Structures are given as C-alpha cells and as structure tokens.
Amino acid sequence: MKSLTHYLWFTTKQRQEIIDITAEVAAQVAKSGVREGLVLVSAMHISASVFVNDHESGLWQDILTWLEGTVAPWDPGRYRHNETGEDNAAAHLRSLTVGHEVIVPITDGKLDFGPWQRVFYGEWDGQRKKRVIIKVLGE
C-alpha cells in the first residue's frame, strides 16, 4: 500500500474564514501515485473544521450567518469555557458542529466527488498559525 502525508499551514487574515483547499488536496493525491484509495483531510486544531460542500460565496455567507445566529454566537459571556480566561468557546462549538475531518474516495487517481463538491478549511478562531493534515492511502 502507498501512503503520503502532507501538511497545509494557514494564518488567516480574519478570525473566521472559509478556504477552498480542493486543489491542494488533489495535488497531493496526484503526487502520491495512489490510483484507488482514500484521502483523509483533517484540521489539527480544535477550533477549525474541514468539510465538503459547494464553492459558492452566498452559501459561505449562509454558513457563517447560521453559525453565528443559531449554533454558536460569538458572545464571550455565554460560555463556561470562557470563564477559564479563554474567549473562543464559540469556535470550539463551531468545529464540533461543522466537523473536524473528511475522507474522500480516490478513483483512477483523482478525487471522486459528486457534482459541485469541494473540500474546505473552516477557520473559526484564526489570525494565528494552524495546520491541516492530508493523508493519502491506497494502491
């Protein structure tokens, strides 16, 4: 079995951002030489997410609005975690809700997506250095 491990590093300009990382994931799949297998893409921080969805700016804004309005409003006084001196409980809850990692099938050496699917990094507490692991496995 072949395998490849690669890390993507991010320092976002904003506290919250959604970044399309599909091209980087596809490049690592190609570099690995795996024709049939899986690629795991995982945020290595507990205040970030990796997810699959559509690359459409209106949807991105809808996601951010949903997280702020329904899931985990950025209200430091609302969370017990913030009583410890932290201010990012909302980011932890957003990561928990959106998801921490994805596994994408590889078929004929390429990411095997449905229509419109892309891989995204969701930063919920940014402006500092963070990373994502890409782990390609297969034959």
Residue ranges of each PLM-predicted region?
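Active-site histidine-anchored catalytic micro-motif
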Residues: 1-139
